């Protein structure tokens, strides 16, 4: 397929690639290249690698034209000329797989005529009849499968026959698809009654309309999955078919994503006892396959020419470039992405991290691109870790697109000073990366970071075994993103001998490029004063954690409470408790009486002599130590919540809204869909909630719930019916009143009780139960009658009892005089 060779949009289907190459270097040289490509693309060494990683089967994508001629090239119409090359490829693969006890599953990836509108996949040529438009093509496919079955009927390492890959064609009811499948099955069973037959649905294998019930007693239904978010219920659409039809399932194709996505999806498949295969073992210039084929300059020149951005290469230049590309297919010439097999096998069963190659040494240089192998949140944390195609477009999980397939963004550079030619970039606040290291001698160290940045103000710090060992480092511009310089101001780091986990943490959203950190021992640990290093918020959202450069004496903590002060947004807050951080020697936790918010500016101060290190040193006084606030964002209630801005969502679609203010809205609602939002309420009270909704056809219903810490128990606070508005973008506002919500932090769940509506936003307001314009929280007269004039406390300004007043009129003495009057008494 063209995208695998970087020619997508230029030459996608194989026949287009071949024609373009013939135009450049002639038919003979093109055929020589294709033969070399087939020879080098998958060899015994590839099979050995798959076996070593843990695979027990190989799905072989086949093009029919390596085994038989196209119908238009047959010397006698309706007959079949057999070509040995394709069968020899299968024979070789079976021979290589047998010592490893690996099965080979034969996949008809390109059927006669092509089986889908997506020509890149099946080599469909729209100027000719497709498989579905030609009985001759269908006959050839049936005959080919019978020929294959005759040849391999007795081979025990054939894992089965995947009859047609990823049909994507308009086939009403699946009728013709089933007819062709049944014809192939009948032909195979005439000669081979043993091997499994794999059946893929229409619409890229996932539409099984018309394909049930099964027509053979040794059949498997095969589905595919790409790009969409991996959720626990992703297989709920297909698992019932397995049970209802009593037919096994096989996930025959997936991939093209990040390591995180791979681990999650494979874990889900294994949990549900569904076998799987992966696409693909190697591609040109990509990071998401185990082997990356190097893109040579000559081939790049060909691509540039096809794009209209370069000169046409000569015939010899083109031939040399393509033969070099074919040579680069060999494993020994590829870039091996060891992180991918690790994600697909080891990481699906453990959260443990392991060194990328071997433990890096201190003293010495730590190359930051060689971080530990493991999952997101265990070996690293990155804000973007997979491509979920939520907006229908590709979204890169790795902005550098080099070296590894995680969310950690890696680029290449030409720096020759303390560098392996790679650096971390595109950093964001809260991200971190871990390294298994071995410290050879206890002592005081300095660190030198190799950094490039166009901007000033990027920040990072280091920790060892999750205890900070440096203050937050602020970076000044080096003059450019590729202008690397030493940042040498990292001193007085105390490290203990032994094996540890070193982490680099990025503390704000100003990006930096950083390639390495070199550690140099400067003296004994006793030469460094006992001092505070950093402070961070804690996930309980009421505490801060202070880090020190030495271990803290636990016996000195209790008496030190009065020596600390915590200031939030300029106001000192009451400290509740101070304690040693669990399982940590260099950290204490200060818990406050009140909650903290993600937007708070927090500083810590210390003045006294109470807190001591285990070596007996008194803590140096400090003031205005800025606390790194990493709390998750919460919506402050009362306030507005944009419906699409949830922490977790299930089942909704997101679309552009035509409502006032623009933005997005949630849509495609069905009963059971839900979205979770993190909220903070600043007082304990009920609220009124406005919901901005639209609906084309009928009414719906929304429920709001407070969810407990386990995420399993819900407490209803209100429900509201959504009206029919006669348009999906015809908006109106409906209101409901909630039960009392306590003060503090909560998870709010918005659940669809009855679907068929769009939701733009919902807004919590303090209620005004009597409708007098004064919020209940300050309304001293909460039940005033409608229309009563009230003051700012919500109480009536005055009242006039109907039976306790008198009005009288005295006329003027003469027309034109002004001595008349009106009187009022109560």
What positions do the PLM features span?
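Extracytoplasmic
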Residues: 343-529, 555, 583, 595-599, ...
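Proline- and Ser/Thr-rich low-complexity, intrinsically disordered segments
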Residues: 769, 796-826
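Short, surface-exposed alpha-helix to beta-strand junction/turn motifs within ectodomains of secreted
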Residues: 542-580, 607-612, 623-628
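Extracellular calcium-associated, cysteine-rich motifs in secreted modular proteins
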Residues: 767-803
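Extracellular glycoside hydrolase catalytic/binding regions
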Residues: 133, 139-283, 288-303
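Aromatic-rich peripheral "rim/lid" segments of glycoside hydrolase catalytic domains that contact
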Residues: 264, 268-361
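Active-site mouth of glycoside hydrolases
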Residues: 1-196, 201-209
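Short coil/turn motif common to extracellular beta-sandwich-like domains
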Residues: 539-545, 686, 813-823
């Amino acid at each position: 397929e063209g995208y695998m060779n970087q020619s997508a949009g230029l030459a996608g289907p194989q026949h287009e690639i071949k024609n373009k190459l013939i135009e450049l270097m002639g038919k003979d040289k093109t055929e020589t290249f294709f033969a070399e490509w087939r020879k080098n693309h998958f060899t015994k060494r590839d099979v050995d690698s798959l076996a070593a990683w843990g695979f027990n089967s190989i799905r072989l994508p086949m093009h029919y034209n390596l085994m038989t001629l196209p119908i238009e090239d047959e010397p006698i119409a309706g007959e079949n000329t057999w070509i040995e090359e394709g069968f020899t490829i299968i024979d070789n693969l079976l021979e290589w797989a047998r010592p490893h006890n690996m099965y080979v599953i034969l996949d008809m990836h390109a059927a006669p005529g092509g089986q889908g509108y997506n020509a890149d996949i099946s080599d469909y040529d729209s100027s000719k009849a497709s498989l579905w438009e030609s009985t001759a093509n269908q006959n050839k496919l049936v005959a080919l499968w019978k020929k294959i079955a005759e040849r391999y009927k007795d081979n025990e390492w054939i894992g089965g026959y995947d009859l047609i890959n990823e049909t994507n064609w308009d086939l009403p009811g699946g009728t013709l698809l089933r007819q062709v499948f049944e014809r192939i099955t009948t032909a195979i069973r005439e000669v081979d009654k043993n091997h499994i037959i794999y059946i893929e649905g229409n619409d890229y294998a996932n539409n099984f309309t018309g394909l049930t019930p099964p027509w053979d007693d040794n059949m498997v239904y095969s589905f595919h999955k790409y790009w969409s978010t991996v959720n626990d219920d992703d297989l709920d659409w297909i698992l019932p078919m397995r049970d209802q039809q009593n037919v096994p399932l096989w996930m025959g194709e997936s991939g093209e994503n990040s390591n995180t996505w791979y681990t999650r999806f494979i874990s889900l498949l294994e949990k549900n006892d569904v076998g799987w295969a992966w696409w693909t073992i190697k591609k040109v210039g990509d990071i998401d396959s185990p082997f990356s084929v190097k893109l040579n300059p000559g081939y790049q020149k060909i691509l540039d020419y096809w794009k209209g951005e370069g000169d046409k290469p000569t015939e010899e230049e083109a031939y040399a470039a393509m033969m070099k590309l074919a040579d680069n297919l060999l494993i020994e010439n590829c870039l091996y992405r060891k992180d991918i097999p690790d994600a697909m096998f080891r990481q699906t069963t453990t959260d443990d991290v392991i060194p990328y190659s071997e433990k890096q040494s201190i003293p010495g240089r730590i190359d930051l691109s060689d971080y530990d192998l493991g999952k997101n949140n265990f070996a690293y944390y990155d804000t973007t870790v997979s491509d979920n195609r939520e907006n229908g477009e590709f979204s890169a999980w790795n902005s550098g697109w080099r070296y590894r397939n995680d969310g950690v963004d890696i680029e290449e550079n030409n720096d020759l000073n303390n560098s392996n030619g790679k650096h971390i970039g595109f950093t964001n606040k809260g991200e971190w990366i871990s390294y298994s290291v071995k410290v050879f001698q206890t002592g005081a160290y300095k660190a030198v970071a190799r950094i490039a940045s166009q901007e000033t103000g990027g920040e990072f710090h280091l920790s060892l075994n999750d205890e900070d060992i440096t203050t937050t480092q602020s970076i000044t511009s080096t003059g450019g993103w590729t202008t690397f310089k030493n940042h040498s101001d990292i001193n007085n780091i105390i490290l203990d001998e032994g094996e540890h986990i070193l982490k680099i943490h990025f503390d704000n959203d100003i990006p930096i490029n950083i390639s390495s950190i070199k550690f140099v021992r400067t003296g004994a640990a006793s030469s460094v004063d006992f001092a505070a290093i950093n402070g961070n918020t804690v996930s309980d959202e009421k505490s801060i954690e202070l880090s020190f450069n030495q271990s803290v004496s636990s016996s000195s903590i209790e008496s030190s409470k009065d020596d600390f002060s915590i200031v939030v947004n300029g106001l000192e807050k009451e400290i509740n408790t101070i304690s040693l951080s669990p399982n940590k020697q260099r950290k204490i936790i200060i818990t406050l009486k009140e909650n903290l918010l993600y937007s708070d500016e927090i500083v810590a101060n210390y003045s006294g002599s109470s807190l001591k290190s285990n070596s007996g040193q008194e803590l140096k006084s400090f003031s205005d130590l800025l606390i790194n606030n990493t709390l998750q964002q919460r919506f402050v209630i009362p306030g507005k919540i944009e419906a699409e801005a949830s922490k977790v969502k299930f089942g909704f679609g997101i679309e552009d809204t035509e409502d006032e203010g623009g933005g997005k809205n949630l849509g495609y609602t069905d009963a059971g869909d839900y979205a979770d939002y993190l909220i903070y309420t600043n007082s304990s009270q009920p609220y009124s909630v406005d919901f901005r909704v639209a609906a084309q056809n009928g009414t719906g219903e929304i429920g709001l719930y407070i969810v407990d810490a386990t995420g399993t128990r819900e407490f209803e606070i209100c429900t509201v019916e959504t009206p029919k508005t006669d348009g999906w973008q015809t908006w109106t506002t409906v209101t409901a009143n909630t039960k009392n919500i306590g003060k503090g932090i909560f998870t709010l769940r918005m659940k669809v009780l009855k679907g068929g509506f769009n939701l733009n936003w919902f807004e919590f307001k303090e209620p005004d139960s009597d409708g007098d314009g004064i919020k209940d929280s300050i309304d001293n007269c909460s039940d005033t009658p409608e229309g009563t004039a009230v003051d700012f406390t919500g109480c009536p300004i005055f009242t006039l009892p109907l039976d306790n007043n008198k009005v009288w009129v005295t006329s003027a003495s003469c027309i034109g005089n002004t001595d008349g009057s009106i009187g009022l008494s109560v």
